[in-house]
Every structure is written in structure tokens, then in C-alpha cells.
Swiss-Prot record:
PROSITE patterns: AA_TRANSFER_CLASS_5
Record's function text: Catalyzes the reversible conversion of 3-phosphohydroxypyruvate to phosphoserine and of 3-hydroxy-2-oxo-4-phosphonooxybutanoate to phosphohydroxythreonine.
Entry EC number(s): 2.6.1.52
Gene that this polypeptide is encoded by: serC
Keyword Oxidoreductase applies: no
Protein species of origin: Burkholderia cenocepacia (strain HI2424)
Cofactor: pyridoxal 5'-phosphate
Protein name, entry field: Phosphoserine aminotransferase
Cofactor annotation remark: Binds 1 pyridoxal phosphate per subunit.
Broad class of enzyme this protein falls into: transferase
Length: 360
């Protein structure tokens, strides 16, 4: 029996994609091989690779000024890879810290430069807001400005993206990429791990403006130097072939759904249903300011936290899994990525109401 999976990542996958991958597991398109067995330089995998790059460019509307790279290491590795590729001769980078992940990025940058905290969304209740551009106090000559546009742990999403002129904007988009249209031209760099909306863990997507490819520090390993990766079409070393294949299937699935405009409408409907249920209740609480609430990751807390384990056990009995909040903040978290159907959110909302009534 398939369950409704609310995991923050690795996360729910479109069932169509899983079934197609299962059908093609032993024999991809008459090749007699599994994708797992293919040479990454053979014509079979090259067709998969190129299709994935093309479909992602189409979905996001990536302009010709930007290159799409497939790397490894996840968003965590990019926290080091970004400064090694962008600092050049500059000594600082600016950070807008809106949650746990951008805070981690800020800390990692200290190994390479003197990062500057341009703004913070932290309040007495934790990370609950996304500072507006007017609040950003940028340094005089930063190499770039870093922003995590969706904080997976804290449930904070930044929707208003400013134009910073000549200063490159770097965004960690791991947990909301492909959930809505984006103006990629506004960014110098976008990066994201695949295990939320792109596909399975193992591949990291980096989208970088081509004129930024000449800034790498001399200490940057060749395998992580974007210029080298771009020059070799993301095939400098053996790529995570199966993860790229799965990502390509997800891109095709997204196109069949009507693209990102259609997906965004679904995500708005799903998140509104869940937030409305929380707000109408005196038993559940979400601490994030409404304007900054994530459509992908919805943390919530029970008024009586001694009942947390009962809540999780009851949810599991109904086939609602992976609802436990991150250990750093506690409570609950429902991650409702693209592949989580509206029916799953409706089932969760029904359970939440039933649980509240039983405890009243």
C-alpha cells in the first residue's frame, strides 16, 4: 500500500516516475541495459543527460546567459563550493539569514572569507520572517549576496527577489525549485540538492551566470570548479547517472502536468488548505509570519506537546508518514512538495481535526 509521505527529503516522488523507472530498470529503451550500467560517455546515457538539461532549461526558462551544471555533494557542499568559485580577489560575501540553512551557509563561508551578516529573520520565536530588501545592510564590495529562498527546517520562504545590480545574488533553492516560476535572470547562481522536488538524492543542480565562471580561488578542487565542469558538460568525472536519469523523468512529468504555472497553482491550493486548518485551530500553531510562510515545508506545533508521540502514532496508522519536525525545532512538519497530491493534504487535515476533537 502506498502511503502519503511528508518527508522533508529524500521526499515523495511522483508515482508515474517510479513506475516508469521500474519498467525501464532492466532494459532502457531496448538497449538491453539498466541506466545504472551505462557508460556515462555512451550514446544511450548522453541522450538522457542532454534531455534532462534541455527540459530543465525549458521548465525554468533559463536564459542563454546561464549554464546548467550537474554536480555532487548536495547543498551542504555548495556552501563551500560557492565561495571557492565566486570570491575571486574579494574578501567578503554578504548573507541574508532567514533560517537554519542560510545560517549554516554563513558559518561555512568563514573558512574562506569574512562573511557579513546583511540581515536576519530571527525573532524571539525563532526564524519567523523574511527581511525585506530595505532591511538589507550590504557591505561595500561583496563578492556576492547569499540567500536561502526556502528554509526547509523553519518553513520560511522568500518571494520578493530584489535586483542587486552588479552584485551577484546566490540562492539556495534546494527545497522549492520547480515549485513555481522563477526569474532566473535575477540570479548569479542558483543551487539545489535533488532530493526534494528534482528527484532522488545524489545529484546537485547548479545554474550559474556564464560571466561568473572565471572567479574561482586557486584552492578550488578541479572537480568542484564550475568553469571546469561547464567546459566538460558536467562530465568531467563520472556523474551520478541514475540520479540524473530520475531527475529527467521528473522534468518530463512536470511538463505533462502543465509546467510550473500549473504546479504553482496546485501548491498554493495545498498549502492554503493546511495553513487555514492550522490558523482556524487553537490546538495547532505555526509561528511564521503569513507573508513568509513556505508552500513546501509547513512546521506546526501542538498546544499540548506531551501529545506529540500520540499524534505521530495516529498519523502513521492512517498512512501519514514522516511528520516529525526537525530535531532542532521540534513539533511537526509537513513537507508538501510537488509530488505530494492534494488528497494527501486533505487526509492530513482530516486527521488533524479528528485528533484535536478527541483531545478537546
Amino acid at each position: 500500500m502506498r502511503v502519503f509521505n511528508f518527508s522533508a527529503g529524500p521526499a515523495a516522488m511522483p508515482e508515474e516516475v517510479l513506475r516508469q523507472a521500474a519498467d525501464e530498470m532492466l532494459d532502457w529503451h531496448g538497449s538491453g541495459m539498466s541506466v545504472m550500467e551505462m557508460s556515462h560517455r555512451g550514446k544511450e546515457f548522453m541522450s538522457i543527460h542532454e534531455a534532462a538539461l534541455t527540459d530543465l532549461r525549458d521548465l525554468l526558462g533559463v536564459p542563454a546567459s546561464h549554464r546548467i551544471l550537474f554536480l555532487q555533494g548536495g547543498g551542504i557542499a555548495e556552501n563551500a563550493i560557492v565561495p571557492m568559485n565566486l570570491l575571486g580577489a574579494r574578501k567578503t560575501a554578504d548573507f541574508v539569514v532567514t533560517g537554519s540553512w542560510s545560517q549554516k551557509s554563513f558559518g561555512e563561508a568563514k573558512k574562506f572569507c569574512a562573511p557579513h551578516l546583511a540581515a536576519s529573520g530571527k525573532t524571539e520565536a525563532g526564524f519567523t520572517r523574511a527581511p525585506a530588501r530595505a532591511e538589507w545592510q550590504l557591505s561595500d564590495d561583496p563578492a556576492y549576496v547569499h540567500l536561502c529562498t526556502n528554509e526547509t527546517i523553519d518553513g520560511v520562504e522568500t518571494f520578493e527577489i530584489p535586483d542587486l545590480g552588479d552584485v551577484p545574488l546566490v540562492a539556495d533553492v534546494s527545497s522549492h525549485i520547480l515549485s513555481r516560476p522563477m526569474d532566473v535572470a535575477k540570479y548569479g547562481v542558483l543551487f539545489g540538492g535533488a532530493q526534494k522536488n528534482i528527484g532522488m538524492a545524489g545529484v546537485t543542480v547548479v545554474i550559474v551566470r556564464e560571466d561568473l565562471l572565471d572567479r574561482a580561488l586557486s584552492i578550488c578542487p578541479s572537480a568542484f570548479e564550475w568553469k571546469t565542469i561547464a567546459a566538460n558538460n558536467s562530465l568531467y568525472n563520472t556523474p551520478p547517472t541514475y540520479a540524473i536519469y530520475i531527475a529527467g523523468l521528473v522534468f518530463q512529468w512536470l511538463k505533462r502536468q502543465g509546467g510550473l504555472e500549473a504546479i504553482e497553482a496546485r501548491n498554493i491550493e495545498k498549502s492554503k488548505l493546511l495553513y487555514d486548518t492550522i490558523d482556524a485551530s487553537s490546538f495547532y500553531l505555526n509561528k511564521v509570519e503569513p507573508a513568509a510562510r513556505s508552500r513546501m515545508n509547513v512546521p506546526f506545533f501542538l498546544a499540548d506537546e506531551t501529545r506529540n508521540e500520540d499524534f505521530l502514532a495516529g498519523a502513521k496508522a492512517r498512512g501519514l508518514l514522516q511528520l516529525k519536525g526537525h530535531k532542532s525545532v521540534g513539533g511537526m512538519r509537513a513537507s508538501i512538495y510537488n509530488a505530494v497530491p492534494l488528497e494527501g493534504v486533505k487526509a492530513l487535515v482530516e486527521y488533524m481535526k479528528d485528533f484535536e476533537q478527541r483531545g478537546a
